[in-house]
Swiss-Prot record:
Protein name, entry field: Beta-ketoacyl-[acyl-carrier-protein] synthase III
Localisation per UniProt entry: Cytoplasm
Quaternary data: Homodimer.
InterPro entries cross-referenced by the UniProt entry: ACP_syn_III_C, ACP_syn_III_N, FabH, Thiolase-like
UniProt source species: Prochlorococcus marinus (strain NATL2A)
Function: Catalyzes the condensation reaction of fatty acid synthesis by the addition to an acyl acceptor of two carbons from malonyl-ACP. Catalyzes the first condensation reaction which initiates fatty acid synthesis and may therefore play a role in governing the total rate of fatty acid production. Possesses both acetoacetyl-ACP synthase and acetyl transacylase activities. Its substrate specificity determines the biosynthesis of branched-chain and/or straight-chain of fatty acids.
Organismal lineage: Bacteria, Bacillati, Cyanobacteriota, Cyanophyceae, Synechococcales
Length: 338
């Protein structure tokens, strides 16, 4: 566990960006492949469609576009970016995709690396970047969440194929000294329950030389115990958010927006109900994108900023949760130009 009480970290959220693939797959289209339909999916998940990366697109393209949009909103010169963290579980290059984004941006002065924490990845990356900025060693950081789970979905598994989509989102963080954006956070993991949701390596071994073999480099499709993940989320997310609010001495009625990982509308509604947060303060775009893993939070944040729902000075309670099992939460003020 890593956490803080209310601290003036002097870190501002000054820009956001997002990007999604062009190809849309609607619920009824999935019903042509597996035994499901639009009503069944929407009733149980809130998802109406999802977007998937096609032949002329890539995860790095989406992540770069999201980063460019965040940099433009922040009005930064790319040469002043010190750090780029890409939160992803589906890199195009297992040795690291963030440096390719750095190159695409022309941010030659930035350190760039990947971070993996599944659907909690964006929050883990956010806290990691904030630590660098709070130390004084860096001033500006891009935090990107991007995933392409469509390539790891078993499209004949009704339990999982209806849930996931592809996308990217980014935020620009700045060490401001006197204006605190991030005021509280907490991160947690429980590996004992990791089997509830995983994308594991295959257990296939091939002969190498006499007396020795090697494991084949391939992964199995996503496996999920939906009921267990739901119970985990509706139990742990309210606890971790409640602890942060208590530490920061902020009442739930002071929250302007509840921004949760976009996994299932029932989870969003259950958490909001625990804090008596009205539905109009709960941010959701599940209907249009489904679960885009590490991208859901920054993608939703950017949409709400650009359509003027989120305004400068708004207080946002945020939580991510997913495979690992891992979960986290953050409380921050938005200080962007919109």
């Amino acid at each position: 566990m890593i956490s803080n009480s209310q601290l003036d970290l002097g870190i501002s959220f000054v820009g956001s960006g997002s990007a999604t693939p062009q190809k849309i797959i609607k619920n009824d289209q999935l019903g042509q492949r597996v035994d499901t339909n639009d009503e069944w999916i929407q009733t149980r998940t809130g998802i109406g469609q999802r977007r998937v990366i096609g032949e002329n697109e890539s995860l790095i393209d989406l992540a770069t576009d999201a980063a460019v949009n965040a940099v433009k909103m922040a009005d930064w010169d790319v040469q002043t970016i010190d750090l780029i963290i890409l939160a992803t579980s589906t890199p195009e290059d297992l040795f690291g995709s963030a440096p390719k984004i750095q190159s695409n941006l022309g941010a030659s002065n930035a350190v760039a690396f990947d971070l993996t924490a599944a659907c909690s990845g964006f929050l883990f990356a956010l806290v990691t970047a904030s630590q660098y900025l709070a130390s004084g060693s860096m001033k500006r950081a891009l935090v990107i969440g991007a995933d392409q789970l469509s390539k790891w979905v078993d499209w004949d598994d009704r339990k999982t194929c209806v849930l996931f989509g592809d996308g990217a989102g980014a935020v620009a963080l700045e060490s401001s000294g006197d204006e605190s954006g991030l005021i509280g956070y907490d991160l947690k993991s429980d590996g004992s329950k990791g089997g509830c949701l995983n994308l594991s390596q295959s257990n296939v071994f091939l002969d190498l030389v006499q007396g020795a073999n090697h494991q084949k480099g391939e992964y199995l499709p996503i496996k999920m115990e939906g009921k267990e993940v739901y119970k985990f989320a509706v139990k742990e997310v309210p606890i971790i958010l409640g602890e942060i609010l208590e530490k920061c001495q902020i009442k739930s009625e002071s929250i302007d927006w509840l921004l949760l990982h976009q996994a299932n509308q029932r989870i969003l509604d259950a958490v909001a109900s625990r804090f008596s947060i009205p539905s109009e303060k709960v941010l959701s775009n599940l209907k249009y994108y489904g679960n885009t893993s590490a991208a859901t939070i920054p993608l939703m944040l950017d949409e709400a900023v650009r359509d003027k729902r989120i305004k400068s000075g708004d207080l946002i309670a945020c939580s991510g949760f997913g495979a690992g099992l891992s979960w986290g939460a953050a409380l921050f003020y938005w200080h962007g130009p919109y």
